[in-house]
Design a protein with these regions (language model features):
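C-terminal "cap" of GNAT-fold acetyltransferases
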Residues: 167-176, 195-216
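A short beta-loop-alpha structural element at the N-terminal edge
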Residues: 19-38, 42
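Conserved beta-hairpin
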Residues: 69-89, 142
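Conserved acetyl-CoA-binding loop-helix of GNAT-fold acetyltransferases
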Residues: 141, 147-160, 184
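Conserved GNAT acetyl-CoA-binding A-motif
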Residues: 132-135, 161-174
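Conserved acyl-donor/pantetheine-binding loop and adjacent beta-alpha core of acyl/acetyltransferases
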Residues: 86-142, 146, 195-197
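Active-site rim helix/loop that mediates acceptor-substrate recognition in acyltransferases
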Residues: 53-76
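Conserved active-site alpha-helix within GNAT-family acetyltransferase domains
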Residues: 152, 164-166, 175-192, 196
Length: 216
């Protein structure tokens, strides 16, 4: 009410954000993959792959490992200290495991969906910039921890590395809700990708020397 004194009981102090750092070892791979799986459980493209919940939780962890596992083995996966969020970056010149992705699709999806999925993969590969770049195939926050700023914290820490090396960064946004976050960090939309009735992916490029963006 008007004129009411403000006491400590009335002041909301949010919990501090967890620290962000590189994943210490592959022994923590399962924790990072579980976080990404939870974070993508409401993602339009991820659920286009696996619309049934049981199928999603059965197969999507294997998809994460095939698509972005090179970040974990390559020492370029960023995670929060409590594993509430993860950003799985691939170094310049490192690519998703195409053989593992093809094998997973053939094993986990009906044959009548293979052509559309493989077409989507092909278009994603063709959309990458020609110059060497850091690639962010997956960034996710546990659904229970979203809207706290963890995604921004992950982006801020990991993009420092791109700026230190003066190398572009590239990603495909599979969820329109995330595009404003990427725009704030200097990514620019450069097209749209879809295949076989899939939800659209928006490829986004962050060009060299964008140091000013990581401070916002």
């Amino acid at each position: 009410m008007l004129g009411e004194a403000i006491t400590a009981e009335h002041i909301f102090i949010p919990d501090p954000l967890p620290e962000v750092g590189l994943l210490e070892s592959v022994t923590h791979e399962a924790s990072a993959i579980a976080t990404v799986t939870m974070g993508f459980s409401t993602d339009p493209v991820a659920r286009w792959f696996y619309p049934e919940p049981a199928e999603y939780f059965r197969w999507f962890p294997q998809f994460v490992r095939a698509f972005a596992g090179g970040s974990i083995s390559g020492g370029s996966a960023y995670c929060t200290s409590d594993y509430s969020g993860a950003a799985l970056w691939l170094r310049p010149g490192v690519h998703p495991d195409e053989e593992a992705m093809v094998a997973l699709v053939e094993k986990s999806l009906p044959k009548d969906r293979h052509a559309a999925v493989f077409e989507l993969f092909e278009k994603m590969g063709a959309g990458h910039p020609d110059e060497l770049h850091w690639y962010l195939p997956m960034i996710a926050v546990d659904t229970h921890q979203q809207n706290r700023g963890i995604g921004s914290s992950l982006m801020r820490h990991s993009l420092e590395r791109c700026d230190a090396e003066n190398v572009p960064a590239y990603l495909e946004s599979s969820n329109p809700r995330n595009i404003p976050l990427y725009l704030r960090f200097g990514f620019e939309p450069i097209g749209e990708i879809s295949a076989g009735g899939s939800p659209p992916l928006v490829p986004m490029l962050r060009r060299r020397s964008r140091q000013s963006f990581i401070n916002h």
